[in-house]
Amino acid sequence: MNISIISVGKIKEKFLRAAIDEYSKRLSKYCKLNIIEVTDEKTPDNASLKEENIIREKEGSLILKHIKDNNFVIAIDLKGKSIASEEFSDLIENCRLTGNSTIAFVIGGSLGLSQQVLSRANYKLSFSKMTFPHQLFRVMLLEQVYRAFRILCGEPYHK
């Protein structure tokens, strides 16, 4: 199975990069992982709604360039569905069983995802009603993908 994580912005913090590298290494026995970083747009401090929408659309266009027609797209969205780790592993397994060999997870920038990206998504997922820095969220997503594969393989995992 192929897993792509398409996210806005680059990871600058060494501790986050180290965590991403660790989970990437752990996941290598379960899937082919591809992490794609698209350029984030600078957001003015007092951006208007119109300016925010323009930024989201620019970032969204960059994201969509990396999504192929046959990808099963899971958008990370505050309004998405919250599920348990076991349900998340079922979602990944159902993709595999239905012939979706590539799952593309999409993480927006500080303003979230454009309507175009949300419309393209096959599934909208929320981890929490809380807001997390998108750089940190990448680590959280990788951990949950790793946990999902361990669940699917019947391997022990921390509950």
UniProtKB/Swiss-Prot annotation:
Matches recorded under Pfam families: SPOUT_MTase
Superkingdom field: Bacteria
Keywords: Cytoplasm, Methyltransferase, rRNA processing, S-adenosyl-L-methionine, Transferase
This protein's GO CC annotations: cytoplasm
EC class of the enzyme, as a word: transferase
Residues engaged in binding S-adenosyl-L-methionine: 76, 108, 127-132
Listed EC numbers: 2.1.1.177
Single GO MF annotation: rRNA (pseudouridine-N3-)-methyltransferase activity
Subcellular location field: Cytoplasm
HAMAP family: 23SrRNA_methyltr_H
Function: Specifically methylates the pseudouridine at position 1915 (m3Psi1915) in 23S rRNA.
Family named by the database record: Belongs to the RNA methyltransferase RlmH family.
Quaternary state and interactors: Homodimer.
Protein name: Ribosomal RNA large subunit methyltransferase H
Organism of derivation: Clostridium botulinum (strain Loch Maree / Type A3)
